[in-house]
């Protein structure tokens, strides 16, 4: 989303805008690290295309995805950050021969680098950081009924978004380490009023975006 990209671009020194096929990329530095930013867009296909173009053009050492997600646990608070340890789809069913959420021929879940997850958990960023399962699908989850349906398949899920697992699958196929940070914008089990989500952006959540900066600085 544009609001997320604006936050992250502000972290870059001497940013340069570059065009690769249909996507704009922003190259710059955070401390001594060369960083490339892009806005993939919403949904699994946009995320996968953006990831492929990033890998083809820049051959990154690792990919970090930053965005917002709905909280699947009532133990979370809005503006907490979930670091994905595993990723799967909540809207994929390929028959009884494979696990719900699993594409045939692919893992049931995609794992983040344990080293990257531990680095994220060690950050002293001033926000609550949690690690766990992120589930993804092309569905804006804004009802108790839908989140309960998802939790029926994935009771350990901490966050629900529309991109993380497709990026994880693409990185798995290309052999690129990956981790996703998701800032909790709303918690459907607590309140299904969509104003939670918009209030989150009104509050800007400046501190939460510092997780990404702190993470890069410690690589």
Which stretches of residues belong to each language-model region?
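N-terminal short beta-loop-beta anion/metal-coordinating cradle
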Residues: 1-58
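Generic non-transmembrane alpha-helical segments
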Residues: 11, 115-127, 153, 170, ...
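Alpha-helix C-terminal capping segments
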Residues: 53-57, 73-76, 168-177
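Proline-aspartate-enriched helix->loop->beta-strand connector
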Residues: 59-64
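Mid-sequence, gly/pro-rich, charge-dense loop/helix-turn segments that line enzyme active sites
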Residues: 72-154
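A C-terminal functional module that forms or caps the active site or interfaces directly
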Residues: 141-193
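His/Asp/Glu-rich mid-to-C-terminal helical/loop segments that flank catalytic regions of hydrolases
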Residues: 188-219
């Amino acid at each position: 989303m544009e609001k997320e990209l604006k936050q992250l671009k502000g972290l870059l020194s001497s940013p340069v805008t570059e065009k690769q096929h249909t996507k704009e990329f922003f190259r710059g530095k955070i401390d001594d690290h060369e960083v490339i930013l892009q806005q993939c867009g919403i949904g699994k296909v946009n995320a996968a295309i953006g990831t492929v173009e990033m890998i083809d053009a820049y051959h990154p050492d690792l990919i970090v995805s930053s965005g917002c997600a709905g909280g699947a646990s009532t133990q979370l608070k809005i503006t907490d950050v979930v670091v994905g340890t595993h990723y799967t789809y909540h809207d994929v069913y390929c028959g009884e021969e494979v696990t719900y959420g699993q594409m045939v021929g692919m893992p049931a879940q995609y794992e983040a680098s344990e080293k990257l997850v531990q680095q994220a958990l060690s950050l002293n960023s001033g926000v609550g950081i949690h690690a766990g399962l992120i589930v993804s699908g092309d569905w804006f989850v804004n009802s108790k009924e839908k989140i309960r349906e998802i939790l029926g398949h994935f009771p350990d899920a901490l966050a629900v978004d529309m991109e993380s697992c497709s990026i994880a699958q693409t990185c798995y196929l290309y052999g690129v380490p990956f981790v996703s940070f998701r800032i909790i914008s709303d918690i459907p089990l607590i309140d299904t009023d969509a104003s939670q989500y918009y209030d989150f952006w009104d509050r800007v959540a400046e501190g939460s975006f510092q997780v990404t900066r702190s993470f890069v600085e410690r690589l």
